[in-house]
Amino acid sequence: MKYTVNIYEVSTEKDKKLRAFAAVTFGDRFKVTGITIREGRSGNLYVSMPQYPTGEKDEQNKPIYSDVFFPKTTDFSTALRGEILEVYQERMGGKNEVDLTYGEEDFDYYVQVVNNRDLSNTTKAYARLVIGDVFVVNQISVKRSFAGNNFVAMPSQRRMVEGKAEYQDICYPVTKDFHDRLQGDIMSQFEQNREKLRSAKEKAR
């Protein structure tokens, strides 16, 4: 699988431990952003994935967070995090983008969709994308618009743009072809799940 790592340097005035942002594009089809390179207490650098609150709390009553997306295997996690740090450390040579490969050359993926049983909720289903069986993207959803249409929503985060708060997708298809394929796969599985639920209800009568 081919993938590209990009590094974006940022001002550290507001966050002294933040060193840079990173983005990874898989197979020229799907891009994940918002990855951060941070400095630890001992001065070491580490890579952190974007997180979201799960709604649960730990024993100290603190919110529990989970990664929006993450490497599925230890081997790919070690490789990806190491390559991101390497690109960052070599950026002074003018290189802030590197093309890499892992495993098989072909780009393959699959989706998993779980329908929401609360039919009154505007979020109709939750989906995850698994790329190359080594990278997982959570927080994809099927939502109902005000007009009553279902659509696929990508993970987003609240960011300040010119002094205004906006929600921006932090991962998304890069090409129209893959955008249409991915949305089609998710909606197809969503409809299949709905049909199975209808059949199960009819049999239970």
Model-derived features: positions:
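Single-stranded nucleic acid-binding surfaces, predominantly the OB-fold ssDNA-binding core
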Residues: 1-205
